[in-house]
Amino acid sequence: MRHYEIVFMVHPDQSEQVPGMIERYSATITGAEGTIHRLEDWGRRQLAYPINKLHKAHYVLLNVEAPQEAIDELETNFRFNDAVIRSMVMRVKHAVTEASPMVKAKDERRERREDFANETSDDADAGDSEE
């Protein structure tokens, strides 16, 4: 079986349906004896340019190992699902299991925010004890 990287974008009004879509597409892959190496829900993000007069979309990334029939079925599902505004399936040489740069950047921002919150609360505590 070959390895694929799949990214699809969902209409922002349909964001609440994304977990169900992920579950359905994952079942398609695992039902065809495929494996999912990485699944990332990037959430709602700004588009680089408008697509169908939309400026935001909900992004999902999948790295899978699956037979061609499963990939063909996924692409057909993407094509006939009106909520999916764009999709891209790329073949890759090997399974990618590490976190994507998008998730790494998000984690770094979260850590910086938490560090800043801890510093400000420490400063506030130190200011209270000096009085």
UniProtKB/Swiss-Prot annotation:
NCBIfam families: S6 (TIGR00166). It comes from Erwinia tasmaniensis (strain DSM 17950 / CFBP 7177 / CIP 109463 / NCPPB 4357 / Et1/99). CDD domains: bS6. Binds together with bS18 to 16S ribosomal RNA. The keyword Ribosomal protein applies. This is Small ribosomal subunit protein bS6. Belongs to the bacterial ribosomal protein bS6 family. GO terms for cellular component: cytosolic small ribosomal subunit. It comes from the Bacteria. PANTHER family: MITOCHONDRIAL 28S RIBOSOMAL PROTEIN S6, SMALL RIBOSOMAL SUBUNIT PROTEIN BS6M.
